[in-house]
Amino acid sequence: MIVKICGLKKAVDVAAAVDNGADMIGFVFAKSKRQVTVEKAHELAKNIPANVKKVGVFVNPTEEELKAAIKGVPLDIVQLHGQEPAKQANRTDAKVIKAFPVKDGKLPTNINDYPNAYILLDAPAEEYEGGSGKTFDWDKINRDMLTKNKLIIAGGLNAQNVQEAIKRFEPYAVDISSGVETNGEKDPEKIKCFIKTAKGVE
C-alpha cells in the first residue's frame, strides 16, 4: 500500500516519515496551519530520497505558482484541492492528484473531468481544505464509479481505521495528516504506527 504523509514542516517529521517507509511526502502551500514556503520545502526536500515522491498541496493556484513550486522544491506531484480547471491537471511537468470533498456520501459530478489525475476523496472542508481529521461517509460511496489504481483515500484516517478503509476501497494509496498528530504537531510514533498498519494489510 502506498502511504502519503502530508503537512510536514520540520526535518524531524520528514525523517520519521521517510525512515518508516512513507512513499509520498506532502508539503502544503495553500493557506493552512501546516503551510510552508517553497524555500522551506526545498530545504526539507534535500533529505528525501529520490524514491519517495514529493507532493505539493495547492488550492486554486495560479499556473505561475504551480510552476515555481514544481521547479523550486522540486515536486514530483501536485495535489489540487480547489476548483481548478481540468486543463491545469493535464500537465507534463508533474503528476497530478485531484482532491474532491465527499458530501452526503455523493461523488462529485465532475470527477471524470480529470482522466489523467489520481483521484483523492476527502471529507468536506472546514476552515481550510483537507486536514480536518474527519472521515466522509464510506458506506454511501458507489465504488463502481471509482478506478482503484487511481484512487487515494483521505479524510480522518488513523492507525485504527486505515485497514478498514483499505479493505473497503482497495485504493492505490492512503493519505494522512491530522491522524498522525498530537496537539497539532506531527508525532513520530503515530507516523510509524500508521505506516506499519497501512502496509500490513493483505
From Swiss-Prot:
Pathway: Amino-acid biosynthesis; L-tryptophan biosynthesis; L-tryptophan from chorismate: step 3/5. It is an enzyme of class 5 (isomerase). Pfam families: PRAI. InterPro entries: Aldolase_TIM, PRAI_dom, RibuloseP-bd_barrel, TrpF_fam. CDD domains: PRAI. One of its GO terms (molecular function) is phosphoribosylanthranilate isomerase activity. One of its GO terms (biological process) is L-tryptophan biosynthetic process. Gene3D superfamilies: Aldolase class I (3.20.20.70). It comes from the Bacteria. Its EC number is 5.3.1.24. It catalyses: N-(5-phospho-beta-D-ribosyl)anthranilate = 1-(2-carboxyphenylamino)-1-deoxy-D-ribulose 5-phosphate. Keywords: Amino-acid biosynthesis, Aromatic amino acid biosynthesis, Isomerase, Tryptophan biosynthesis. NCBIfam families: PRK01222.1-7 (NF002300). Belongs to the TrpF family. This is N-(5'-phosphoribosyl)anthranilate isomerase.
